[in-house]
Every structure is written in structure tokens, then in C-alpha cells.
Amino acid sequence: MKKRLLIVDDEPSIGLILEHYFSKEYDVVVKANGHEAMSWLQEGNFIDCIVADFEMPLMNGLDFIRQLQVSTLYKNIPLLMLSGKDETSTKILCLKHGADDYIVKPFNPEELDIRIKNMLKKIKI
């Protein structure tokens, strides 16, 4: 059975590229912002890993992390943040609040895949 990957990004092109790249290996779900993603999760949908953008409308990446962290259902789901910000302070903020990894746009999909696999390996231990 395929692992389910949730992509949360307000740039439709990012969602399409990642869905295309990962669909052979993962069951990919794409949502446009943190609010939409949280609503989908709260409907009872299960996810194995989340890749979310930092800068999004309605609910930004940091607020999305905070929402995940207050829930016993979601706080242990591996979470990788994407961002166009290559600032140490932003990376530290995301990691400090519960993100497991952080990658800067533009990124190499192969590197993203390796990071996702590494996060998923850790939850098997």
C-alpha cells in the first residue's frame, strides 16, 4: 500500500509538479493552503507525511504547524516545510515549532524525495 503524502502550497504549479513527480510512489493529495489542509485532515483523512509551504494565504505555514502540534492526531506526522525564504531565522522558527525539515525553493525534487524518505524511515523506529 502506498504512503499518503499531503502537499500544501498556494502555487498551483508546485502542487502539480510534486503530484506528478511523487504519484508513482505515493498517494498524493494537494491542498492550496493550511486552512484547506486542516479541514481535510479534520474530516478524518489519514496522512503519512506533509510537505507544506511557509508563505500561504488564510493560514500560513507557521500557523499550520501550530495547528498540527496541538492535536494528538497530527503532531507526530512528519512535516517538511518549503519556502522561498533562505533565511536562518525562518528555518529556525519552523524547526523550533515542530517542522521536521526545511527546504528552500527552488528545490530539486530528488532531494525532496530523499528528505521525505528519511523522515518516513524515522517513524518506523
How would you name each of these model-derived features?
Residues 56, 94:
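Receiver (REC) domain active-site loop signature in two-component systems and cognate sites
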